[in-house]
Amino acid sequence: MLNIIFIGAPGVGKGTQSALIEKDYSISHIATGDMLRENIANGTELGKTAKSYMDKGELVPDSLVIDMLKDRIKKDDCKNGFMLDGFPRTIEQAKELSNILESLNYKISAVIDIFASEEIIIDRLLKRGRADDNEETIKNRLKVFENQSKPVLDYYSDKAKIIKIESIGTPEEVYAKIKKELDVL
């Protein structure tokens, strides 16, 4: 069973690489944003509660996201393994995730830290053409990501294999580096 945490700044290629990993290793890709939207769309109790926060423009509390994640990881499609994208973002979330996984008798196999230079990320995001992707906003998002991700990586340093991948080259070249690391786990 391969259980992966995927950490990377906006624009480093997490989505592209996650899709390739999901396909090759037959593991479920769990993105917290998608999970929230799915719970809301399905009208689950957790989804209704999350929607009440979102409708007020508030952040959905960690405890609610954790509960959704626990329900999600228990599903049959996670029995072969899973990949978490966008979670955990903080030490508190990482500790809660550890508690969940321990209760289910699961372990994190690896944490993939995918990175690129600020210049490359800014260039990629500006080319993406989203309304909220301007240089100042991107730099702020990168600073927030950097401040949050380093402590999470430190937390996992003695709990799982940390795989550092520089996101330079074609998506296929980057994936070849990831696959080489995952195949020895």
From Swiss-Prot:
Subunit structure: Monomer.
GO molecular function: adenylate kinase activity; ATP binding
UniProt source species: Brachyspira hyodysenteriae (strain ATCC 49526 / WA1)
Binding site for AMP: T32, R37, E58, L59, V60, G86, F87, P88, R89, Q93, R130, R141
Residues reported to bind ATP: G11, V12, G13, K14, G15, T16, R128, G169
Record Pfam families: ADK (PF00406)
PROSITE patterns reported for this sequence: ADENYLATE_KINASE
Listed pathway(s): Purine metabolism; AMP biosynthesis via salvage pathway; AMP from ADP: step 1/1
One of the protein's GO biological processes: AMP salvage
Entry's Gene Ontology cellular component terms: cytoplasm
InterPro entries registered for this protein in UniProt: Adenylat/UMP-CMP_kin (IPR000850), Adenylat_kinase_CS (IPR033690), P-loop_NTPase (IPR027417)
Residue ranges, annotated region (LID): 127-133
Role description: Catalyzes the reversible transfer of the terminal phosphate group between ATP and AMP. Plays an important role in cellular energy homeostasis and in adenine nucleotide metabolism.
Taxonomic superkingdom: Bacteria
EC number from the UniProt entry: 2.7.4.3
Compartments where found: Cytoplasm
NMP: annotated span: 31-60
Signal peptide interval: none
Note on domains (UniProt): Consists of three domains, a large central CORE domain and two small peripheral domains, NMPbind and LID, which undergo movements during catalysis. The LID domain closes over the site of phosphoryl transfer upon ATP binding. Assembling and dissambling the active center during each catalytic cycle provides an effective means to prevent ATP hydrolysis.
Similarity comment text for this entry: Belongs to the adenylate kinase family.
Protein name: Adenylate kinase
Top class in the EC scheme: transferase
